[in-house]
Amino acid sequence: MKLSLLSVELALLIATTLPLCWAAALPVGLGVGLDYCNSSCTRAFDCLGQCGRCDFHKLQCVH
């Protein structure tokens, strides 16, 4: 009985701390992965020769 209680507590601990780790790491990952340029875009080929591709959610060219 004690073993199963311990595993439940451990699972709860992991479940509560893991989202915090993801929330802390997410902006860092996005900052590294998406380097926004000054160019705005509305079409896929607006960013050719500048930054790579168009992020249609932000309407900006990204590397």
Swiss-Prot record:
Residues 1-23 form the signal peptide. Keywords: Disulfide bond, Knottin, Signal, Virulence. The keyword Disulfide bond applies. Residues 24-35 form a propeptide. The keyword Transmembrane does not apply. Disulfide bonds join C37-C51, C41-C54, C47-C61. This necrosis-inducing peptide induces a hypersensitive response on Cf-9 tomato genotypes. Race-specific elicitors are compounds which only induce defense responses in genotypes of host plants which are resistant to the pathogenic race that produces the elicitor, but not in susceptible genotypes. The presence of a 'disulfide through disulfide knot' structurally defines this protein as a knottin. This is Race-specific elicitor A9.
